[in-house]
Amino acid sequence: MNYPHPIIAREGWPFIAIAAVIALLIHAVGGFGFAWPFWLLLVFVVQFFRDPQRPIPAQPNAVLCPADGRIVAVETAQDPYANREALKISVFMNVFNVHSQRSPVDGAISKVEYFPGAFLNAAIDKASTENERNAVVIQTASGKTVTAVQIAGLVARRILCYVRAGEPLSRGQRYGFIRFGSRVDVYLPLGSRAKVSIGEKVYASSTILAELEQ
């Protein structure tokens, strides 16, 4: 499947343009000696907004990672968005990770809920319940419920979500973006088998987070 998005995310184009104009102006006035920190900033902004295509595993019961980052939680927890006990797997994204979010499963969206909140360090546990967040609840064709929650972080102050309740989602489909360091929590039915461990580096779409019970 072709990835229908530019390799540099559209969300970053205004920031890249501003950084490029500033670097060019300072270079023109003061030369490279004054401008090099601004060129370095431009490189950072470009790499932050990269959005590469990723291979998508074919296993039908696989739950794919929704974001690049590092696993900070694998535990049984309450899923407040679907009112159930669930297997919770959390991915923390630092400022050097790709920050687009992609659907972990095929299914239909039953609910999208936004919650205002704080901007605590997204790596800590209470960020899941206290930070600004946006939950997307997905029902698979087999009746399983999968919840993916975008969570703002200490620096990230803007959650973008491009889907609505009632719409279909395909595994690996890009559905959102969080700027500048953040977290995604995934809640799965009890009985799902986690395929990752705390501290593991993971990649959106290509890493299998868990397998749903068949």
Swiss-Prot record:
Cofactor: pyruvate
Keyword Metal-binding: no
GO biological process: phosphatidylethanolamine biosynthetic process
Metabolic or biological pathway, per its Swiss-Prot or TrEMBL entry: Phospholipid metabolism; phosphatidylethanolamine biosynthesis; phosphatidylethanolamine from CDP-diacylglycerol: step 2/2
Record-listed E.C. numbers: 4.1.1.65
Compartments reported by the entry: Cell membrane
PTM per Swiss-Prot/TrEMBL: Is synthesized initially as an inactive proenzyme. Formation of the active enzyme involves a self-maturation process in which the active site pyruvoyl group is generated from an internal serine residue via an autocatalytic post-translational modification. Two non-identical subunits are generated from the proenzyme in this reaction, and the pyruvate is formed at the N-terminus of the alpha chain, which is derived from the carboxyl end of the proenzyme.
Record InterPro entries: PS_Dcarbxylase, PSD-A
Topological relation to the membrane, as annotated: Peripheral membrane protein
Catalytic activity from the UniProt record: a 1,2-diacyl-sn-glycero-3-phospho-L-serine + H(+) = a 1,2-diacyl-sn-glycero-3-phosphoethanolamine + CO2
Any one GO molecular-function label of the UniProt entry: phosphatidylserine decarboxylase activity
Active site: 182
Modified residue annotations for Pyruvic acid (Ser): 182
Site keyed Cleavage (non-hydrolytic): positions: 181-182
GO annotations of cellular component type: plasma membrane
Lineage: superkingdom: Bacteria
Alphabetical UniProt keywords: Cell membrane, Decarboxylase, Lipid biosynthesis, Lipid metabolism, Lyase, Membrane, Phospholipid biosynthesis, Phospholipid metabolism, Pyruvate, Zymogen
Co-factor remark: Binds 1 pyruvoyl group covalently per subunit.
Function: Catalyzes the formation of phosphatidylethanolamine (PtdEtn) from phosphatidylserine (PtdSer).
Family classification: Belongs to the phosphatidylserine decarboxylase family. PSD-A subfamily.
UniProt subunit comment: Heterodimer of a large membrane-associated beta subunit and a small pyruvoyl-containing alpha subunit.
Protein name: Phosphatidylserine decarboxylase proenzyme
Protein source organism: Burkholderia lata (strain ATCC 17760 / DSM 23089 / LMG 22485 / NCIMB 9086 / R18194 / 383)
